[in-house]
């Protein structure tokens, strides 16, 4: 469809009307350029897909919503906006779209949050109830759904009252009633514990109400994981050809796609034996109490026992082989170089993939049959078996996926990283097997780039080292396929609004010097805090270990510090805002992930402290396998893998400071390698243009280094 004059006029009229709705609206050339580029791509006038980097301040959300809605209406398609985190998803759903509804008549929109963000009305009813009969019923259903105390029961009763009276939509983030993580875990549910259409609360369930609204909506706000799953299953969202898709925070997309090529599962022989025995008993119960019209051949007791026995023998053999590869210590790990399994192990994995897939199919068949029997059997007994079969299905789905991945030699032309771990919990030894694909371009091509006619990939940061090369390699987007790559200018004057400070550190932030380097960092930080020049500060670390060492040096300042992990992130940010607004000093402290999406303007944040250049962890099995593969292709892992990742992280961290025309301040980076190493200049050149200062560091009294207890990473 061409971008007609009428469509251009409609987009222009909405943009003009928007300016009347926003106080102190500042027209920006980059925003107008983005609206035009998005419109041309979605209308099919310019290329296949568009990757557009829109720095903070451009107003990217409204820049894709306005043309997206106009073209969706013209073509009778659904605009799907996908984000990577709940905060941005909720901002678009609760703030941006309601604003646009004021200027766009009858705009229909909804949000598709993950199941875990919604309350389960069945669980809420149980936790809000004071009736012993209700608790007895749930105990029979194997659910741990009793309030811990009377206060918790009253809180749940208030939540239930709000839900029943439509004051609350069931989303965790949309209630003012405090819900701690432990309580929410019992209030929400997952796929394995959901009764779906068999549930008494199905019609009013917030999760399923939201899913039904998708069919009527013009705009659906989703997340990347849901979009990928929907494209795979062809469910939830409209057909790909009837979509206009915007992937906001698009730099996360390769990592989300990688989740489809990532699996870790326990494979300990005793644990496996228990799961198989429980499943055999469950099948026997189904045949005895809820016999299907046609009994699946594999459900025959003798055949099923033989099938499970073969499965157990293979798992037992694999346990023995993996234990030989792993060191003799109780806790151990073995990674297979280049993801290449020995022939014997590969044969076992291929057979396990087939056997577990057959059990997955059997569990699914029984589950479908059980779901049709709700009108003819004791509902409580039936629901108990449905829940148990649901959990068995989830377990076999995970195992089937694990062994399918293990059986792959390559994915998207690159190895699949594979490793085994042994760990001790409660005195018991557990064996785990892990698989992660290191490239996902083929999956993205199949599910997205080839399926949806036109897609917008956007973020404040898409490039690293001033190049789209890393994004192209990881995502599979390419110019020769008709994809366009655009980097918009920032609307801010960074030279006037801020500066970069690189203190004159004696030590580089290497592991051997970590204690001395952090002591220097703490001394400079203390000096800055005591100067009282900055009310709102943020300190970011590359590792939890370094953060804890830093905190040991500033124990006397602990009341000023709001540290990641002390409380949920949103509560820390709320408290920080409150402190600074009241004229107090406040310091947020966390890992680099803590800062993503953090939007603190003006005096709320005027000084950002960055511990060091955040290179990828060198001990990650995935990073090591990728490095081996790159070397086998005569490519330099540091240039292809480590440096672009470090550049991206640094751009994200520095980007926390200047969020509006009224922002000011400085970014302190405690890493002299930016000035002494050849790559340092390249990292600095990829940042906004700030003046650079190099102040002296106060004298430090170094504490004696305590031997850290060895820690072992379970996952990448």
Regions found by a protein language model. Give the residues of each.
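Conserved RecA-like P-loop NTPase helicase motor core
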Residues: 503-515, 566-675
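A contiguous, basic/glycine-rich beta-loop/short-helix subdomain that forms a polymer-engagement track
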Residues: 185-218, 228-237, 365-506, 517, ...
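Conserved helicase motor "Helicase C" RecA-like lobe of SF1/SF2 P-loop NTPases
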Residues: 542-566
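Walker A/P-loop
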Residues: 44-66
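Conserved RecA-like ASCE P-loop NTPase motor core of nucleic-acid helicases/translocases
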Residues: 78-87, 456-460, 535-542, 669-670
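Conserved interdomain hinge at the start of the Helicase C-terminal
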Residues: 446, 503-542
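Signature of the SF2 helicase/ATPase Hel1-core->accessory helical subdomain module
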Residues: 64, 70, 90, 94-98, ...
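A substrate-engagement module of RecA-like helicase motors
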Residues: 2-20, 26, 75-78, 83-218, ...
């Amino acid at each position: 469809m061409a971008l007609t004059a009428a469509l251009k006029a409609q987009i222009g009229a909405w943009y003009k009307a928007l300016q009347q709705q926003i106080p102190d609206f500042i027209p920006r050339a980059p925003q107008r350029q983005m609206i035009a580029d998005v419109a041309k791509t979605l209308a099919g006038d310019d290329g296949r897909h568009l990757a557009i980097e829109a720095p903070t301040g451009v107003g990217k959300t409204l820049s894709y919503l306005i043309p997206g809605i106009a073209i969706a209406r013209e073509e009778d398609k659904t605009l799907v906006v996908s984000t990577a985190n709940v905060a941005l998803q909720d901002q678009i759903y609760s703030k941006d779209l309601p604003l646009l509804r004021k200027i766009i008549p009858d705009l229909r929109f909804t949000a598709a949050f993950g199941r875990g963000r919604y309350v389960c009305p069945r669980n809420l009813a149980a936790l809000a109830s004071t009736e012993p009969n209700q608790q007895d019923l749930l105990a029979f259903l194997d659910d741990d759904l009793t309030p811990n105390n009377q206060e918790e029961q009253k809180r749940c009763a208030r939540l239930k009252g709000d839900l029943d009276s439509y004051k609350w939509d069931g989303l965790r983030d949309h209630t003012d009633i405090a819900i701690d993580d432990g309580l929410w875990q019992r209030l929400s549910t997952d796929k394995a514990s959901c009764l779906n259409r068999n549930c008494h609360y199905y019609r009013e369930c917030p999760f399923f109400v939201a899913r039904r609204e998708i069919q009527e909506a013009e705009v659906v706000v989703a997340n990347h994981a849901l979009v990928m799953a929907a494209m795979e299953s062809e469910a939830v969202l409209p057909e790909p050809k009837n979509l206009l898709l915007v992937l906001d925070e698009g730099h996360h997309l390769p990592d989300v796609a990688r989740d489809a090529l990532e699996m870790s599962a326990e494979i300990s022989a005793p644990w496996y034996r228990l799961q198989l025995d429980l499943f055999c008993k469950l099948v026997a119960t189904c045949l005895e109490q809820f016999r299907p019209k046609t009994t699946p051949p594999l459900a025959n007791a003798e055949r099923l026992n033989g099938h499970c026995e073969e499965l157990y023998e293979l798992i037992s053999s694999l346990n023995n082989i993996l234990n030989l590869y792993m060191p003799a210590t109780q806790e151990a790990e073995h990674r297979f170089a280049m993801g290449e399994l020995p022939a014997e192990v590969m044969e076992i994995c291929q057979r396990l993939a087939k056997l577990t897939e057959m059990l997955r199919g059997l569990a699914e068949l029984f589950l479908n049959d059980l779901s049709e029997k709700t009108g003819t059997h004791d509902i409580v007994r039936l629901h108990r078996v449905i829940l148990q079969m649901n959990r068995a299905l989830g377990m076999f789905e995970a195992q089937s996926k694990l062994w399918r991945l293990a059986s792959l030699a390559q994915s998207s032309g690159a190895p699949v990283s594979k490793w085994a771990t042994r760990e001790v919990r409660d005195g018991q030894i557990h064996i785990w097997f892990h698989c992660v694909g290191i490239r996902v371009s083929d999956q993205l091509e199949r599910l997205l780039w080839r399926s949806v006619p036109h897609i917008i990939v956007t973020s404040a940061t898409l490039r690293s080292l001033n190049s789209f090369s890393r994004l192209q390699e990881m995502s599979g987007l390419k110019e020769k396929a008709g994809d366009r790559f655009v980097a918009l200018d920032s609307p801010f004057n960074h030279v006037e609004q801020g500066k970069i400070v690189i203190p004159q550190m004696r030590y580089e932030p290497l592991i051997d010097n970590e204690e001395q380097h952090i002591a220097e960092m703490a001394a400079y930080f203390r000096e800055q805090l005591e100067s009282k020049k900055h009310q709102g500060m943020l300190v970011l670390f590359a590792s939890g270990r370094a953060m804890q060492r830093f905190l040991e040096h500033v124990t006397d300042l602990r009341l000023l510090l709001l540290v990641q992990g002390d409380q949920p992130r949103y509560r820390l940010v709320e408290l920080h805002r409150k402190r600074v607004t009241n004229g107090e000093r406040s310091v947020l402290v966390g890992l680099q992930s803590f800062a993503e999406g953090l939007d603190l303007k003006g005096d709320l944040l005027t000084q950002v402290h960055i511990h060091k250049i955040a290179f990828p962890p060198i001990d990650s099995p995935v990073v090591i396998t990728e490095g081996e593969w790159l070397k086998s292709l005569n490519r330099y892992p540091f240039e292809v893998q480590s440096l672009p990742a470090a550049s991206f992280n640094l751009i994200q961290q520095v980007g926390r400071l200047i969020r509006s025309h009224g922002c000011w301040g400085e970014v302190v980076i405690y890493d002299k390698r930016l000035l002494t190493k050849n790559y340092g200049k390249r990292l600095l050149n990829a940042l906004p243009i700030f003046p650079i200062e190099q102040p002296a560091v106060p004298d430090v009294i170094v504490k004696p280094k305590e031997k850290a207890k060895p820690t072992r990473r379970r996952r990448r």
